[in-house]
A protein has these predicted regions:
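A non-catalytic alpha/beta surface segment that caps or lines the substrate-entry region
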Residues: 1-11
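Hydrophobic residues positioned within well-ordered beta-strands of beta-sheet architectures
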Residues: 2, 75, 129-131, 194, ...
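N-terminal beta-rich core of secreted/periplasmic extracellular enzymes
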Residues: 11-31
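Structural motif
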Residues: 12-14, 102, 126-128, 286-290
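Histidine/acidic-residue-rich, glycine-tolerant segments that coordinate divalent metal ions
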Residues: 24-43, 49-50, 55, 67-178, ...
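Alpha-helix C-terminal capping segments
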Residues: 60-65, 278-282
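Metal-dependent amide/peptide-bond hydrolase catalytic core
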Residues: 152-331
Length: 331
C-alpha cells in the first residue's frame, strides 16, 4: 500500500497500563474471579492488562514487517493512567514532539464486541489534588484548648467543596474521595489528609472548579488555625480530536468490523490523561484522536468482578495492521 503522505511521518501508537499500586483490592471477594495479579488482593479492573497485550501484539507485528514501512513508529506504554498521573511526565520528555499522527486507545465499556470508535465522546478536563492539614495535638479532656484540630479543618473543607456553586447549564463535577485524620479518640487531631478531584467539560470550567476548591481548603484551614499543603497529583485536559486522524481511523475500522460497529459513541467517559499527550502532539503540528475498542465486560470498570471479552485484543491488532500501512506503508 502506498503512503498517504509525501514525507515520512511519525505515528504514535499509545497504550496505557496500570501497575498494582493503582489496582483495586479483592480481599473481600466471595465469588471466584478470572483475573487477578500476582500481587495478592489486587487486579487491574479496567482493562489495562488488555491494553498492554494489544501493544505487545502490535510491536511483534511491526517487528516482523519493518521492511514494509518508511517512517518511525513509536509505541508508548503509559503507567499511572488511574488518577491521570502518567501522561504529564512522559510528555515533558519530548517523546511526542516530532509525532505527526497520534492514536490512543481503551477497551471495554460493555459495548458489543467489535465496536471501534475514533469518536468516543466527551472526556472532561480534570485536576486531582492532595491536601495535607497540619494542626497541633492536645489531650482532648485535660487541655483541648491547646490543640489545633486538623480533622475539623479537613471536614469543613470537604463540606465546603461539595457546596461549590456550579455554573448553570455547564458540565462540571467534583468529589472528595478520601479524608483520613487523627491519632486516637482522646487526642485533638493534629493531622488530616484529603484526596479530591474536580472536572469540567472545558479547561476554563475545570480551572474554575479547581480554584474554588483550593480557596475552600485554605479558608477551612484558616478557620481552625491549621496549616495546609496542597499538591496537584494528576491532571487531564479536554478532548479535541482532529478530523483527519478520525477519518483514517474509520477507514481502518471498517476494514475490520461492520459499518454499524464503526461509529461515533457519544459517551461521557470521565477523564483521560491521554488528552495531555494529544494536546502536546497538536501543539507541535501533529494530529490525533482516541479510539475505543468496545467489548462485553462481566462488570463495570473499576468493579471487583470486572473482566473483558479477549476477542477485542485481536480486533485491535487488526485495526492497527490496517491503520499503520495507510500512514507509513511503502507497498
Amino acid at each position: 500500500m502506498s503512503p498517504l503522505f509525501s514525507k515520512p511521518v511519525v505515528p504514535a501508537l499509545f497504550w496505557q497500563f496500570v501497575s498494582t499500586w493503582t489496582a483495586l483490592t479483592l480481599m473481600k471477594l466471595t465469588k471466584p474471579v478470572t483475573v487477578r495479579l500476582m500481587k495478592a488482593g489486587h487486579m487491574h479492573s479496567c482493562g489495562h492488562d488488555g491494553h498492554t497485550t494489544m501493544g505487545i501484539a502490535v510491536c511483534n507485528w511491526i517487528q516482523e514487517n519493518l521492511d514494509q514501512f518508511c517512517g518511525t513508529i513509536k509505541v508508548v506504554f503509559q503507567p499511572a493512567e488511574e488518577g491521570v498521573r502518567g501522561a504529564r511526565p512522559m510528555t515533558e520528555t519530548g517523546i511526542f514532539d516530532d509525532v505527526d499522527f497520534f492514536f490512543g486507545n481503551h477497551l471495554g465499556f460493555n459495548l458489543p464486541t467489535g465496536t471501534i470508535s475514533p469518536e468516543p465522546g466527551v472526556f472532561l478536563a480534570s485536576t486531582k489534588l492532595d491536601a495535607t492539614f497540619t494542626g497541633l495535638a492536645a489531650h482532648s479532656g485535660a487541655d483541648p484548648q491547646k490543640g489545633k484540630n486538623a480533622l475539623l479543618a479537613g471536614a469543613a473543607a470537604a463540606l465546603a467543596i461539595h457546596g461549590i456553586t456550579r455554573p448553570i447549564g455547564e458540565v462540571t463535577a467534583l468529589n472528595v474521595g478520601t479524608l483520613v485524620a487523627g491519632q486516637g479518640r482522646n487526642v485533638v487531631a493534629p493531622n488530616a489528609f484529603m484526596q479530591l478531584e474536580v472536572r469540567g467539560e472545558t479547561e476554563e470550567l475545570n480551572a474554575y472548579m479547581r480554584d474554588q476548591a483550593i480557596r475552600k481548603i485554605k479558608a477551612s484551614a484558616d478557620m481552625y488555625d491549621c496549616q495546609v499543603d496542597i499538591v496537584k497529583a494528576g491532571e487531564a485536559t479536554e478532548f479535541k480530536p482532529d478530523q483527519e486522524a478520525i477519518e483514517l481511523a474509520y477507514i481502518a475500522a471498517r476494514n475490520v468490523t461492520t459499518e454499524e460497529l464503526a461509529r461515533p459513541l457519544g459517551l461521557k467517559l470521565g477523564s483521560e490523561d491521554c488528552t495531555i499527550m494529544l494536546r502536546r502532539v497538536q501543539q507541535h503540528g501533529g494530529k490525533g484522536t482516541f479510539v475505543v475498542f468496545g467489548c462485553r465486560t462481566s462488570a463495570g470498570h473499576h468493579q471487583r468482578l470486572f473482566d473483558f471479552d479477549e476477542e477485542v485484543i485481536g480486533i485491535a491488532l487488526r485495526f492497527y495492521q490496517n491503520l499503520i500501512p495507510m500512514i507509513v506503508g511503502i507497498k
